[in-house]
Swiss-Prot record:
UniProt entry keywords in alphabetical sequence: Cell wall, Disulfide bond, Secreted
Family: Belongs to the thaumatin family.
GO cellular component: extracellular region
The species this protein was found in: Taxus baccata (English yew)
Name under which the protein is recorded: Thaumatin-like protein 2
UniProt superkingdom: Eukaryota
Length: 11
């Protein structure tokens, strides 16, 4: 995955 799940949560 290029973007970690944690990053998606912050979005």
């Amino acid at each position: 995955n290029q973007c970690p799940q944690a990053y998606s949560y912050a979005k």
